């Protein structure tokens, strides 16, 4: 099966070149899943996200677009997503959840490496700035789990052991 973009339309072709696969209904959710996969792979970008959002400008479409934008595979896109998520209060709970999940979707893990230290440096600020639910989404979804190793585990234990963190049991439990 091959997925490609033709203009603003997604085409699914089987090995014979047929564009329609029997039994496969490509609805809005599947289009977003496929498009986000293309975004992560660097095969689609902002213009395709905008075109799909124009086609599916629903609450679910808004969430999917936020996740797809945060998944764009460039340092500039990751920085923009980080700032929007961590430093602003612009997004709703649902959009924060979708975008923060999209942030970690990468093929090149090097895109996430700059955010390990920044995660721990900003965690307490995030906790104080945002509502509980948004802070919970950010703390869980932005945690650099894809970069898991002994150094990250040690850094996490060290952060949890800080006196100011010990005073916030809910934050410690999330971590």
Give the predicted meaning of each segment.
Residues 2-4, 8-175:
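Long, ordered, helix-rich scaffold segments
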């Amino acid at each position: 099966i091959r997925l490609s973009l033709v203009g603003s339309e997604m085409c699914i072709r089987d090995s014979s070149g047929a564009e329609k696969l029997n039994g496969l209904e490509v609805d809005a959710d599947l289009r977003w899943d496929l498009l986000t996969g293309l975004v992560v792979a660097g095969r689609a970008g902002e213009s395709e996200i905008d075109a799909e959002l124009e086609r599916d400008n629903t609450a679910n479409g808004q969430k999917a677009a936020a996740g797809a934008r945060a998944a764009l595979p460039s340092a500039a896109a990751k920085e923009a997503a980080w700032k929007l998520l961590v430093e602003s209060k612009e997004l709703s709970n649902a959009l924060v959840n979708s975008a923060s999940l999209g942030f970690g979707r990468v093929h090149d893990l090097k895109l996430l490496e700059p955010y390990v230290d920044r995660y721990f440096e900003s965690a307490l600020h995030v906790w104080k700035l945002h509502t509980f639910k948004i802070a919970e989404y950010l703390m869980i979804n932005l945690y650099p789990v894809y970069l898991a190793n002994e150094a990250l585990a040690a850094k996490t234990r060290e952060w949890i052991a800080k006196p100011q963190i010990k005073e916030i049991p809910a934050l410690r439990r999330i971590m």
